[in-house]
Amino acid sequence: MDTIDQTPHRSYEVRTYGCQMNVHDSERLSGLLEDAGYTKAAAGQAPDLVVFNTCAVRENADNKLYGNLSHLAPAKERNPDMQIAVGGCLAQKDRDVVVKKAPWVDVVFGTHNIGSLPALLDRARHNQRAEVEILEALEAFPSTLPAKRESAYAGWVSISVGCNNTCTFCIVPALRGKEVDRRPGDILAEVQALVNEGVVEVTLLGQNVNAYGVSFADPDQPRDRGAFAALLRACGQIDGLERVRFTSPHPAEFTDDVIEAMAETPNVCPQLHMPLQSGSDRVLKAMRRSYRKSRFLGIIDKVRTAMPHAAITTDIIVGFPGETEEDFQDTLDVVRQARFTSAYTFQYSKRPGTPAAEMDEQLPKAVVQERYERLIALQEQITLEENQKLVGAEVELLVAAGEGRKNAETARMSGRARDGRLVHFRPEGNLDGTVRPGDVVTVVVSAAAPHHLVADTPVLTHRRTRAGDSFEKGVTPKTPPIGVGLGLPQIGAPAPLPVQMGCNA
């Protein structure tokens, strides 16, 4: 990669929109920039560089980006040395359109070449013109780049990039490319590196995690349909790793071995986020979702048999083209049967470039809004009822930062239970000093609401952790590049992982 010749201590700010993939990519961008000599801008400081890591999934993504870019135009005019970069899915989609709409932007880069950002910034500054570089295929796994992690106690670990599905409403495969899987050994090495830094919770990321193992980049790594279940079990062998989560699985490829691994691996959390999208078989077919509601509900039954207290969450789209009232009632019926702990609900958003955008029978906004409100009302009722079942229960929390908007006025702190539920608690009782984000407490739930639980009873136990120590010091992990490029010959093999991790590397 090109080196960057720049004034020392240029400050940066990364603004992230969209999914967990983007959040994790932004950690990579921060790591790259800090390796190139930038420092993160302090709160309230005008940065020398602003990087937008964009999303293209929602209809208003374009308006949000270009509106924010227009707000920066006066700052750029006042300070011509300031640089603005736009990356992510919307940049991959819009390409040269970005600098046509916002000519004060210095760099546009895509989803496949985030590692080029420092060099592109240097080139734009040297050439005094915008640099637009969009690649059609992934240049290197993001894991081969350094990362400046946002959290002292929880970390993202990407197991794959891209997606082989062809959902008619989704533009992500066109922007992220076909699925490419990382080697198990590289993934576990990254997890171990995070744990070595004090991280206690890891979330494995992929557009379709259950497909992991069928698209390895390394030609010497054989296809393995059981690779994801083996990966979960291998994570269970890492000392100091207390919680493992993953997102997102696809119902069409959800297999029994994964359910068994979840139930039998103690540090894999009793939580499953599995997108439904619609409860109508007719709509699922139009979406090209390749499963039907009976299969979806069957998976939930198996998960609850293996893990009776598992919290199951989902994604639902309301108002897909051609959705009838009968179709919508099918969705409500699945919601009633599944009794999701919570649901991320969306009104269908037409995305240019997707098959659904060209479908007939696009629904009126008023119809979609009315159905959306009915779905929200039903799901909130179910969520409250499910949360009320936990009143009086003892739960273990990983204390979190920034999860409670009213914590200052209520004198509470917040944490996540093992099943992912948000709990606000009073840091009083059997404490071992000050409670910090990253510490672990045990509390008894005293009240329930649709979006959270409350524990106003005294804390039963408090365990201080290395993650809490790091948070208190203001230190977050900075993980080095891990793994090799996409099928390229590697120079030297990584150190072998312990045999008991149980996953072929």
Curated annotation (Swiss-Prot):
It catalyses: N(6)-dimethylallyladenosine(37) in tRNA + (sulfur carrier)-SH + AH2 + 2 S-adenosyl-L-methionine = 2-methylsulfanyl-N(6)-dimethylallyladenosine(37) in tRNA + (sulfur carrier)-H + 5'-deoxyadenosine + L-methionine + A + S-adenosyl-L-homocysteine + 2 H(+). One of its GO terms (cellular component) is cytosol. InterPro entries: Elp3/MiaA/NifB-like_rSAM, Methylthiotransferase, Methylthiotransferase_CS, Methylthiotransferase_N, Methylthiotransferase_N_sf, MiaB_methiolase, rSAM, rSAM_horseshoe. Binds 2 [4Fe-4S] clusters. One cluster is coordinated with 3 cysteines and an exchangeable S-adenosyl-L-methionine. Residues 388-459 form the TRAM domain. [4Fe-4S] cluster 1 binds at residues 19, 55, 89. It holds the Pfam family UPF0004. Its cofactor is [4Fe-4S] cluster. It is found in: Cytoplasm. Its EC number is 2.8.4.3. One of its GO terms (molecular function) is 4 iron, 4 sulfur cluster binding. Residues 149-385 form the Radical SAM core domain. NCBIfam families: miaB-methiolase, MiaB/RimO family radical SAM methylthiotransferase. Monomer. Belongs to the methylthiotransferase family. MiaB subfamily. Catalyzes the methylthiolation of N6-(dimethylallyl)adenosine (i(6)A), leading to the formation of 2-methylthio-N6-(dimethylallyl)adenosine (ms(2)i(6)A) at position 37 in tRNAs that read codons beginning with uridine. This is tRNA-2-methylthio-N(6)-dimethylallyladenosine synthase. The gene is miaB.
